[in-house]
Amino acid sequence: MYKRQVYESLKLLADAGLTFDVVATKHEHMECVPIVGEKVPQLKMVIDHLAQPPFKDGTPGQWGEDMRMAAANPNVCAKISGLGTASGDWDGWTADSIRELVHWTIDLFGADRCMLGGDWPVSVLAGGYVKAITAYKQIFSERPFAAQEQISYKTAMAFYGVSLV
């Protein structure tokens, strides 16, 4: 990750107005986010699947520190997706089992830097797309309506530069 060519390539993305989805599954991936942010400050990044958060002990631990470091960069967003498969309990996960992590992330990044993702077709492995979206929407409904809209579609529209018209 520290090769000059990597940063040059990421700068090309940024210069073209494109974004970078960070598919992080461990600490070593996440520790690159602030480094990339420093080397390519104009690059917009999104952390896919909340970087596979821990579900076992209920504390943010190293994952939480990694997310705090990422959230320090205003060009980094968090994609709330893939949590059913990340939970390790593909059949038994529920909105209740992911609620705390989702709210923790929204509180950390703010609704304007969180976006909903479906993780289809992978979500099929953990109960399906409808189960995932229903669980996320149930959790988002505990937030003000403006935050629900922001997370459900407005953040993604702004981040990826798309419009409804």
Where are these regions (language model features)?
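Short, active-site-adjacent cap segments at secondary-structure transitions
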Residues: 85, 122-124
